[in-house]
UniProtKB/Swiss-Prot annotation:
Protein name: Large ribosomal subunit protein bL20c
Keywords: Chloroplast, Plastid, Ribonucleoprotein, Ribosomal protein, RNA-binding, rRNA-binding
UniProt entry tagged with the keyword rRNA-binding: yes
Source organism: Mesostigma viride
Subcellular location: Plastid, Chloroplast
GO cellular component, one term: chloroplast
Gene Ontology annotations of biological process type: ribosomal large subunit assembly; translation
Gene name linked to the record: rpl20
HAMAP family listed in its UniProt record: Ribosomal_bL20
Superkingdom to which the source organism belongs: Eukaryota
Record GO terms (molecular function): rRNA binding; structural constituent of ribosome
Length: 115
């Protein structure tokens, strides 16, 4: 088998990894091996946290709706149940935005769901 000189290919590969590791702390942005390990770890974190972000936002929306609904003397679960039974099709994201930015409109929605 003939010898393959990988000078350019290996350097290009290492530079690609080191460019991805820009902004990392300490040796993680300078040394190839630690940078490579950190890149793998950071990609894993990014994948995991893309799913976690959806959970966290849903939790935040529910907390905001719950706080606003309790100001209107109704619990979150009762409000959601009444919205479903009265066929008011507002998702949690929109309800949370209304509760945060426009309290009187949220109170009207609660009143509509009661009737």
């Amino acid at each position: 088998m003939t010898r393959v000189k990988r000078g350019n290919v290996a350097r290009k590969h290492r530079n690609k990894i080191l460019n991805l590791a820009k902004g990392f702390r300490g040796a993680h942005s300078v040394l190839f091996r630690t940078a490579n390990q950190q890149i793998i770890k950071s990609l894993r974190y990014a994948y995991r946290d893309r799913a976690r972000k959806k959970r966290d936002f849903r939790k935040l929306w529910i907390a905001r709706i719950n706080a606003a609904s309790r100001q209107n003397n109704i619990s979150y679960s009762q409000l959601i149940n009444q919205l479903k039974t009265s066929n008011i099709l507002l998702n949690r994201k929109i309800l949370a935005q209304i509760a945060l930015l426009d309290g009187p409109v949220f109170s009207q929605i609660v009143m509509e769901s009661n009737s």
